[in-house]
């Protein structure tokens, strides 16, 4: 099993690479790529950790060597948010980065499962899809926007609010991966009841959690460590699915035939071909239904931006 991390020298990339080095199955290969010259050194640093995961690092303009034979590609390359920016402000820089990297993926490892971390995810996943379509290798079951950070934040915040063991908290987050498009389905959390005020406050906190971190870091970065953990969880789930493990379910932003938008985050069953099945997200409350319907214009606009960028 070979996993490639693109953008591996950045804050998210290094955290993700560390977690993968310690958690990937024995015998796996971990391939790190970044434009930054430090990248081979990051690989050497990680190689001293005593796990049976081989690490190699590649720097420079061309990620091809890092991508050869990759089963899973996790893309975190791009610039991070600073105070006063929202995820859409990142579009102007990150759109081109994602396009260029995906052109290499399309040629070098078109069958790989690709998880996009680079923001704005609502748009960058659409860019990735268009690049793969133009190359004639698009498979909607192999492309994912990683929204796991919204899920782990939801789990954490709910456990804190209600005094629960966080390992027991399960919550689906649907929609997209920015602002109002992030919709945690709090009505479905088992064994917990929320007041209307708690639902409104919790939903807003989850939607704005990225900004909470950006402001707390005071210009020193964005959510890198928690995003690294979220991406590792999702990446390991992709690997487990590829290895034939049963009942591997995660939420992700996918081209899954949703009635709501071309790309929509909801629970998916993972397997040997990526998405084995898009799962229904179930009964939702009136508050959630209203929030879902209200986000769709924003989400569709984000997707359209990505499609038009590649044209």
Swiss-Prot record:
One of its GO terms (molecular function) is L-malate dehydrogenase (NAD+) activity. Pfam families: Ldh_1_C, Ldh_1_N. Keywords: NAD, Oxidoreductase, Tricarboxylic acid cycle. One of its GO terms (biological process) is tricarboxylic acid cycle. Disulfide bonds: none annotated. InterPro entries: L-lactate/malate_DH (IPR001557), Lactate/malate_DH_C (IPR022383), Lactate/malate_DH_N (IPR001236), Lactate_DH/Glyco_Ohase_4_C (IPR015955), Malate_DH_AS (IPR001252), Malate_DH_type1 (IPR010097), Malate_DH_type1_bac (IPR023958), NAD(P)-bd_dom_sf (IPR036291). The keyword Chloroplast does not apply. The active site is at 177 (proton acceptor). It comes from the Bacteria. Substrate binds at residues 81, 87, 119, 153. NCBIfam families: MDH_euk_gproteo. Catalyzes the reversible oxidation of malate to oxaloacetate. Belongs to the LDH/MDH superfamily. MDH type 1 family. Homodimer. HAMAP family: Malate_dehydrog_1. This is Malate dehydrogenase. The gene is mdh.
């Amino acid at each position: 099993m070979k996993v490639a991390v693109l953008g591996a020298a950045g804050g998210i990339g290094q955290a993700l690479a560390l977690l993968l080095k310690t958690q990937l199955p024995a015998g796996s290969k971990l391939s790190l790529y970044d434009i930054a010259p430090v990248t081979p050194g990051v690989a050497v640093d990680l190689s001293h950790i005593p796990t049976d995961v081989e690490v190699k690092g590649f720097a420079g303009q061309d990620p091809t060597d890092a991508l050869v034979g990759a089963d899973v590609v996790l893309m975190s390359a791009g610039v991070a948010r600073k105070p006063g920016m929202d995820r859409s402000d990142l579009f102007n820089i990150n759109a081109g980065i994602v396009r260029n990297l995906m052109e290499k993926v399309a040629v070098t490892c078109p069958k790989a499962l690709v998880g996009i971390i680079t923001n704005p995810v609502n748009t960058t996943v659409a860019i990735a899809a268009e690049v793969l379509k133009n190359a004639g290798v698009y498979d909607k079951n192999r492309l994912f926007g990683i929204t796991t950070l919204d899920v782990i934040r939801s789990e954490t915040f709910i456990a804190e609010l209600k005094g629960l063991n966080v390992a027991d908290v399960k919550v689906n987050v649907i929609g997209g991966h920015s602002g109002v498009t992030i919709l945690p389905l709090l009505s479905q959390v088992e064994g917990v009841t929320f007041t209307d005020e708690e639902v409104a406050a919790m939903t807003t906190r989850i939607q704005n959690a990225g900004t909470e971190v950006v402001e707390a870091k005071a210009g020193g970065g964005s959510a890198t460590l928690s995003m690294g953990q979220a991406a590792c969880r999702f990446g390991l789930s992709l690997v487990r699915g590829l290895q034939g493990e049963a009942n591997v379910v995660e939420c992700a932003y996918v081209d899954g035939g949703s009635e709501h938008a071309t790309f929509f985050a909801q629970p998916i069953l993972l397997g040997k071909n990526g998405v084995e099945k898009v799962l229904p997200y179930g009964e939702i409350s009136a508050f959630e239904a209203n929030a879902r319907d209200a986000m769709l214009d924003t989400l569709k606009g984000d997707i359209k931006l990505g499609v038009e960028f590649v044209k």
